[in-house]
Every structure is written in C-alpha cells, then in structure tokens.
C-alpha cells in the first residue's frame, strides 16, 4: 500500500537574492527572488552556505521518511542547520568541526568565519512582513541552568514556554519537553510563516468532499475548487506532476504529486538540481482542480538522525 504522503511538499526559501534553504510546513511556500531571466545580483554571504544547506535538507528528509514510513513529515531544515551552526560557535575545536562537517561543510573550502557570516546573513534575509505576508525566524539561548543555577528548572521551562508562545503568536503552544537535571543550556529556535494566495480560492465554492489519505482510507474535508492559470508540468522521468501556486508578497508554493506507487522513487531521486530544472520547465496552463484544506502537526526526535 502506498504511504500516506501522497503529496510531497518541497519548499525552497530564496530570500532577497537567492539565499536558498528548504522548508515544509502547513502550506509550504517558496520565496522567489524574481524572474528567471533577471540579471544576477552581487554575491552575498549566504550564497556560500546555500549548497550545503540544500544538500543537508534532502539528506535529513530522506532519513525522516525512512524512519517514519507512511507518516506525514513536517520540518524546517534551515532552522536545524542554523541551530547546529550556532552551537558550534561556542564549542571546542573538535566538536565545532564535527558539527559543521555534519552539516555538509568542507572547512577547507568554506572557512568557519564565512559559514558564520553566511548564517547570520540568511537569518536577516529570511524575514518579511506585510499585509498579506508574515515570515519571522529567530532563536534564543537559555543558559545558566542546572543544579547550581540561580533559577529552578521549572522557572526556566516557564520562561521558555512564554518566549515560544509570544514569538509564534501562540501557534505552537507550550514547549512539551521537560528539562532534565543535567540540562545546563537550551537553544530555542522558531519559524512562523503565513502567506495569502495570489489567486484566492472562492469560499462559496468550498464544500465537504472525501479525500483519500492512502489507497484505502478517506476522510471528509472542506474541498476548495478553483479554475485558474498556474504554472504546471509533468516529469516523465521522475513520474510526478509539479504545480506552482503563487502567494502575495513574492512567495510561491511547489506541490509535487507523485504517480500512484511512485513516492519512494521520487524521494530517492530528488536532488537540488531537480528543483532548478522544474522551475525552468514549468509552463502556464489553465487548470480546473480541487484542493483540500489541511493541517499538519508533527513532532520529531532528531538525536538519532543527525550526523
């Protein structure tokens, strides 16, 4: 039976000037810097870390898919990369090298100083706010914890919960992990993205319909309907279809629909170059399609997955 991940939502964030990172979330979005034929801008610090970030994202996705067959996957790779990079900056030399190499960096090619500069540049660029777009990302280190700390672990956890709820506007709720007595520091990382469709669905055309989450199970969902022009292609080699839907605020979502039974084939074949190829081959077509309203929630433990 085919896994329930019938849609593969691969998201790229290209903030400002092609600083690339990957993300999956409730309505995954690709922030796109402009037309394909636009002239390239000057090199930015984040360019030097983009290739490693993309490669890390695909490797982590495959690990998540392998360890949770048939389950939905929701993660923000650049957030994980940034957290590990930030931890490395205060670590001993051996640990710092291990963390950065685990993220896919070759330190003889990209020095530590350039990696640090690139992540700070990316953090600044992955932010946007407007009437129809909100993108925030930040992290905070809570240190001075443990048996000899001035505050109890319960007080520290309360501060972390309050920070998380405030920064994510209550979308993530309280932080669920209990702090152990051996905990001396906590690094909290968050990302919030909300964007409206450029061509909104007609709410009057939405009606309850069945949606199959796998070959044998269906649920009733609010099914949106739209007839509009979107960029679309069918990849015969990877046996999938790709739909690009634009949002307000210069953002875009890529939805990837594998042919029946071909999800694993598609996952194994995905490369950073694949996204670039798709973006150049998409053509505008008049589409008449149904689209379910959906929500995804997922908790992942990464201790055994990260290199």
Swiss-Prot record:
Cell compartment(s), UniProt: Secreted
Domain of life: Eukaryota
Keywords: Glycoprotein, Protease inhibitor, Secreted, Serine protease inhibitor, Signal
Annotated signal sequence range: 1-21
Major location category of this protein: secreted
Species this chain originates from: Homo sapiens
PANTHER family tied to this protein: SERINE PROTEASE INHIBITOR, SERPIN, SERPIN A13-RELATED
Entries under InterPro entries matching the protein: Serpin_dom, Serpin_fam, Serpin_sf, Serpin_sf_1, Serpin_sf_2
Family to which this protein belongs: Belongs to the serpin family.
Name this protein carries in UniProt: Putative serpin A13
SUPFAM superfamilies given in the database record: Serpins (SSF56574)
Glycosylation sites (chain numbering): 150, 250
GO molecular function terms attached to this record: serine-type endopeptidase inhibitor activity
A GO cellular component annotation in the UniProt record: extracellular space
């Amino acid at each position: 039976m085919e896994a329930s991940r019938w849609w593969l939502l691969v998201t790229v964030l290209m903030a400002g000037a092609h600083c690339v990172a990957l993300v999956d979330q409730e309505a995954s979005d690709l922030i796109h810097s402009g037309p394909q034929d636009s002239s390239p801008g000057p090199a930015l610090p984040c360019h030097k870390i983009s290739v490693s970030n993309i490669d890390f994202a695909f490797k982590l996705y495959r690990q998540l898919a392998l360890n949770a067959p048939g389950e939905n996957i929701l993660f923000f790779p650049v957030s994980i990369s940034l957290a590990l990079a930030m931890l490395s900056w205060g670590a001993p030399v051996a640990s710092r090298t291990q963390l950065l190499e685990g993220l896919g960096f070759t330190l003889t090619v990209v020095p530590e100083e350039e990696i640090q500069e690139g992540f700070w540049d990316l953090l600044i660029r992955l932010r946007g706010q407007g009437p129809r777009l909100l993108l925030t990302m930040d992290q905070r280190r809570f240190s001075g914890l443990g048996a000899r700390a001035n505050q109890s672990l319960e007080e520290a956890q309360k501060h972390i919960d309050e920070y998380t709820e405030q920064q994510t506007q209550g979308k993530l709720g309280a932080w669920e992990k209990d702090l152990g007595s051996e905990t001396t520091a906590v690094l909290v990382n968050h990302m919030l993205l909300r964007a409206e469709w450029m061509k909104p669905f007609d709410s009057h055309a939405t009606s309850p319909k069945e949606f199959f989450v796998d070959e044998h199970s269906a649920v009733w969902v609010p099914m949106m309907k739209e007839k509009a022009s979107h960029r679309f292609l069918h990849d015969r080699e990877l046996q999938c279809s790709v739909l690009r839907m634009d949002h307000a605020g210069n953002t875009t979502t890529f939805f990837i629909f594998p042919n029946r039974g071909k999800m694993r084939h598609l996952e194994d074949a995905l490369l950073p170059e694949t996204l670039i190829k798709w973006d150049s081959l998409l053509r505008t077509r008049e589409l008449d399609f149904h689209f379910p309203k959906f929500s995804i929630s997922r908790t992942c433990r990464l201790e055994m997955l990260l290199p």
